[in-house]
């Protein structure tokens, strides 16, 4: 079984008086924010902090985005990542690591999949209340705050700062179920312009760099039965999902020569992926040392990275990996319901 976990200072906030939109306007504002990157180009610097179990990790990146779907992110800090960058053109991402002289190319058609985006928007409206707050200043620009409150638990799961003019999200915070902060991203500065040199998005691999195979996702399909039939083994769907989660797509992907069935679930904000394969291979935790756990007579391993948890186990000749923005208790409950 092979998989990878993908991961990403506080500033004073000035509050201005502003009228509070009606609920219908709140939902329209969130949808506009989701769609803004398809229409708005910009250059800026963004800071991200992720809180783990023992410490916090902070990064600073220069972001250059040319609508609708070209983005370059270059690490400025910490020093260990300085100079690394990735370029996403549509559904293809090229990651360049100058220190290791290594390049990785990944393919994910679902990143530009209208089915996935529209389904998430519907789930977001069904499972979360968009509560508009005051206007605050982010990167020198007025931005409307919107809290996304889970309808089942009453907990705020995410807060957005949406630029009043362009509707681009200038800052974002995500929270654990206990209300503690999981991660925060915030533009220190941003300039809206479409005049970005084409060379910024050049993806030619530098001479002498080793090309490492990245993950090659298939096109996420809403034809679940066809995807299951093409998996090559009898696939299993979980019998339990947390409130609000629905399956939004499935695909058969390949990574390092290993074929995986990928089932994708979402509640509009949080995502959950279940990977299955029938290969006799060891999990790849990307250099992170896993912890062990047990359930229903199974030995399992897991790792946590901020709000994201990854749980792996084997059963009846199948290898399973669950990864999502949920705690171990919730993932274990889902795993117990996966019965081959």
Model-found features: residue ranges?
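Bacterial N-terminal signal peptides
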Residues: 1-10
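N-terminal mature ectodomain segment of secretory-pathway/periplasmic proteins
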Residues: 14-101, 126-177
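Short, solvent-exposed recognition patches
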Residues: 52, 60, 102-105, 113, ...
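Short amphipathic beta-strand/extended segments with alternating polar/hydrophobic composition
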Residues: 58-62, 84-89, 104-110, 185-187, ...
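A generic structural motif
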Residues: 77, 100, 110, 149, ...
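Extended beta-strand-rich segments in extracellular/periplasmic secretory proteins, especially
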Residues: 118-175, 207-262
């Amino acid at each position: 079984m092979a998989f990878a976990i993908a991961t990403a200072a506080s500033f004073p906030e000035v509050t201005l008086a502003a009228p509070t939109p009606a609920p219908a306007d709140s939902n329209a504002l969130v949808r506009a924010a989701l769609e803004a990157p398809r229409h708005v180009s910009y250059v800026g610097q963004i800071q991200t902090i992720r809180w783990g179990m023992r410490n916090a990790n902070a990064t600073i990146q220069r972001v250059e985005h040319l609508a609708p779907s070209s983005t370059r992110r270059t690490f400025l800090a910490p020093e260990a990542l300085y100079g690394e960058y990735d370029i996403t053109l549509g559904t293809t991402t090229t990651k360049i690591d100058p220190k290791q002289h290594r390049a990785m190319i990944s393919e994910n058609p679902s990143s530009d999949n209208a089915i996935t985006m529209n389904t998430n928007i519907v789930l977001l409206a069904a499972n979360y209340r968009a509560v508009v707050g005051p206007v605050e200043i982010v990167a020198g620009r007025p931005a409307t705050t919107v809290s996304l409150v889970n309808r089942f638990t009453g907990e705020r799961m995410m807060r957005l700062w949406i630029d009043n003019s362009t509707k681009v999200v200038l800052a974002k915070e995500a929270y654990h179920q206990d209300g503690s902060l999981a991660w925060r991203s915030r533009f220190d500065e941003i300039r809206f312009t479409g005049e970005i040199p084409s060379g910024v998005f050049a993806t030619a691999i530098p001479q002498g760099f080793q090309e490492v195979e990245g993950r090659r996702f298939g096109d996420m399909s809403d034809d679940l039965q066809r995807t299951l039939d093409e998996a090559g083994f009898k696939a299993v769907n979980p019998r339990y999902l947390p409130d609000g989660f629905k399956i939004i797509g499935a695909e058969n992907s390949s990574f390092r020569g290993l074929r995986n069935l990928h089932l994708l679930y979402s509640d509009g904000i949080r995502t959950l992926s279940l990977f299955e394969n029938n290969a006799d291979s060891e999990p790849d935790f990307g250099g992170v040392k896993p912890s062990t756990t047990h359930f229903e007579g199974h030995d399992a391993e897991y790792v946590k990275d901020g709000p994201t948890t990854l749980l792996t186990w084997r059963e009846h000749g199948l290898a399973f990996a669950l990864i999502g923005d949920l705690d171990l208790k919730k993932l274990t409950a889902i795993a117990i319901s996966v019965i081959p």
